[in-house]
A protein has these predicted regions:
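Conserved PLP-binding active-site segment in aminotransferase class I/II-type PLP enzymes
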Residues: 1-62, 83, 108, 255, ...
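PLP-dependent aminotransferase class I/II
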Residues: 27-32, 36-43, 115-118, 127, ...
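PLP-dependent aminotransferase-like
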Residues: 57-153
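A short alpha/beta connector and helix-capping loop motif
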Residues: 98-104, 156-166, 383, 387-393
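Structural preference for beta-strand elements that scaffold enzyme active sites
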Residues: 141-143, 165, 371-373
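Conserved active-site segment immediately N-terminal to the catalytic lysine
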Residues: 144-178, 193
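Short beta-strand-to-turn element immediately C-terminal to the catalytic PLP-Schiff-base lysine
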Residues: 168-169, 183-188, 219
Length: 398
């Protein structure tokens, strides 16, 4: 079966798991990550959401409203709440999947502490529109959510540099991975020092248990997502037997992982250091895969293709269809797993429905209902394209 995702890891990463934990690996990873993102400083965290919560603390933002997209990963508002602030949700633009910045500007009040644009699925935020907002509100911190996008660019401008800081995720579904983990980057030296100070009293060192768990987790995940094996794994996943490993949110709860305050370990950093050398090749391959899909699926009825931007990094290739469940079922019958990441509109979730930042976001609701993610790791592309041509044309003619 063709899995919906597969981390780009090889022998260098697996060999890193067999080496003794090396003191200084985390700072080395931070320096390498900052250089890759063309920023002055980077700070590693156990999760991107932990980094966001600590960043808001370092900025002195508390008891404020934080503007964020309604259609994004739910861990973002979770981190906002854990930081002592309140998320205010803004609808999305169907044409580029990202937060409607004009609508976001209308939400700015005296209580607004920051705004978090997200380059969802690797599609860059419209930096021209954002520049106008920043000019009209020069004191408002902009935090770029680059968990999906990393170094995506808008008209040649790197998104991650257009704000006070940027937040990245590093689990195995991301463009590059440190098994688990997150990173915050900035060009502001004073903020970097304060962020590290906050981390010092908020985050405990990684335990030996965490280090060993990560040594085992990465090869296990790589094997589970190996196509000849994945059919059996997918059966267990659909039965709910793997929920503790694959389900990252609870519809009714605002929570964080149990180890959200246990720092990144040296084993994770060692894997991350090796991943940095792969980044350019990973992005080149994903752009090639996206171009393949864009060409092969063009003109098919009942499918809306994602927006095309030259600077996109394509963490996901996300189409829109009206009959998503039928498409997913038919694909599974053909040995293809399609994804539906961000299958929720956050304000509609029970955990947020009655909070002060609730807003009705119809576009986000529609996108959450229609979005389908195609496998981007590069395997089975011809089979996937053939499936779409045969299935969509057949459905359209009946």
């Amino acid at each position: 079966m063709i899995p919906r995702l597969r981390p780009c890891i090889g022998w260098p990463e697996l060999l890193a798991l067999c080496m003794p934990a090396r003191k200084g690996a985390v700072p080395e990873f931070e320096r390498g990550f900052a250089a890759l993102m063309e920023q002055g400083y980077a700070a590693a965290f156990p999760y991107g959401r932990t980094g966001l919560a600590c960043l808001l603390e370092a900025l002195g933002i508390r008891d404020k409203e934080i503007i964020c997209p309604a259609w994004t990963c739910v861990v973002v508002p979770h981190a906002i709440v854990y930081s002592g602030n309140e998320p205010v949700f803004v609808d999305s633009r169907p044409e580029d999947y990202n937060m409607d910045l004009e609508a976001a500007e209308r939400e700015i009040t005296a209580r607004t502490g920051a705004i978090i644009p997200t380059s969802l699925f690797g599609h860059p935020v419209d930096l021209d529109c954002l520049a106008g907002l920043r000019a009209r509100h020069p004191g408002l911190p902009v935090i770029q959510d680059c968990a999906h996008s990393f170094a995506a660019s808008w008209n040649g401008k790197p998104v991650q540099k257009e704000g006070i800081a940027a937040v990245f995720g590093l689990n195995i579904s991301k463009l590059i991975t440190s098994i688990f983990g997150g990173m915050v980057t900035t060009d502001d030296a004073a903020l970097a020092r304060e962020l590290c100070r906050v981390r010092e009293y908020t985050i405990s060192p990684a335990s030996w248990r965490k280090e060993w768990k990560n040594r085992l987790y990465l090869p296990a995940a790589a094997m589970a997502l190996y196509p000849p094996v994945y059919g059996a794994i997918n059966t267990l996943e659909r039965m709910g037997s793997l929920n503790r490993f694959v389900k990252y949110y609870d519809e009714v709860a605002i929570d964080m992982p149990k180890d959200w305050q246990e720092g990144m370990g040296a084993v994770q950093a060692a894997v991350g250091i090796r991943q940095l050398t792969r980044y350019a090749d990973i992005i080149t391959r994903r752009r090639g895969t996206a171009a393949f899909y864009h060409k092969q699926l063009a003109g098919l009825p009942d499918i809306k293709l994602p927006p095309w931007a030259e600077g996109a990094t394509w963490s996901h290739y996300t189409i829109r269809v009206k009959k998503r469940e039928e498409l997913l079922r038919q694909a599974l019958r053909q040995g293809i797993q399609l994804g539906w990441l961000v299958e929720y509109n956050i304000p509609d979730m029970a955990a947020y429905r009655n909070r002060p930042g609730f807003r009705d976001c119809p576009a986000a609701r529609m996108l959450a209902r229609e979005a389908v993610n195609l496998p981007m790791w590069g395997g089975g592309l011809l089979k996937i394209a053939d499936f779409f041509r045969s299935h969509i044309v057949y459905q359209h003619s009946n």
